[in-house]
């Protein structure tokens, strides 16, 4: 076997061409982290505005914020969607601003630090959303009985 012939075959071969561009992979990872971090607050803001502007008209099992007390009467249903609309809009707006600041900082971080920060942001978002839903449910239970009647007097729409 001729060694010179073998060298001539691999003369134009560049091993580095097979390796991915790490800058491109880091760029894709950063973009995906931004999407994952911003998706929750933007969806929360969108649903909050939708519940304020155009809530579902009747209690149903397919659309709307479903909770046993809120589905008992039309008054409880509209009250629930107004309350949830306000809470989700405010929380969505606040989280959008805060998460945009964090997403802006991803470029200055190392990739693993940015990933850990993104995971922390998503966990905080989920915790705040669950707390907001819990508070809304408690307010609904306090304001309405299980049959959908307002507990504090005779409030009309």
Residue ranges and their predicted role:
Residues 66-83, 156-157:
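Short membrane-interface loop/juxtamembrane segments of multi-pass integral membrane proteins
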Residues 94-112:
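Juxtamembrane "helix exit" motif at the C-terminal ends of alpha-helical transmembrane segments
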Residues 1-17, 45-56, 86:
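Alpha-helical transmembrane segments of integral membrane proteins, especially early/N-terminal helices
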Residues 111-156:
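Alpha-helical transmembrane segments and their immediate juxtamembrane interface regions
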Residues 2-38, 111-122:
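Long, highly hydrophobic alpha-helical transmembrane signal-anchor segments
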Residues 81-95:
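Select subsegments of transmembrane alpha-helices in polytopic membrane proteins
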Residues 45-64, 135-146:
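Membrane-water interface of transmembrane alpha-helices
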């Amino acid at each position: 076997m001729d060694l010179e012939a073998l060298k001539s075959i691999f003369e134009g071969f560049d091993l580095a061409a097979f390796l991915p561009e790490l800058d491109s992979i880091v760029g894709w990872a950063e973009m995906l982290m931004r999407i994952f971090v911003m998706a929750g607050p933007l969806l929360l803001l969108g649903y909050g505005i939708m519940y304020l502007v155009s809530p579902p008209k009747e209690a149903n099992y397919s659309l709307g914020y479903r909770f046993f007390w809120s589905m008992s009467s039309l008054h409880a249903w509209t009250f629930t969607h107004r309350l949830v609309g306000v809470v989700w809009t405010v929380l969505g707006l606040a989280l959008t601003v805060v998460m945009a600041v964090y997403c802006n900082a991803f470029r200055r971080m190392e990739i693993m630090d940015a990933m850990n920060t993104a995971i922390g942001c998503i966990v905080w978002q989920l915790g705040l959303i669950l707390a907001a839903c819990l508070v809304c449910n408690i307010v609904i239970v306090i304001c309405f009985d299980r049959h959908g009647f307002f507990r504090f007097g005779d409030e009309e729409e």
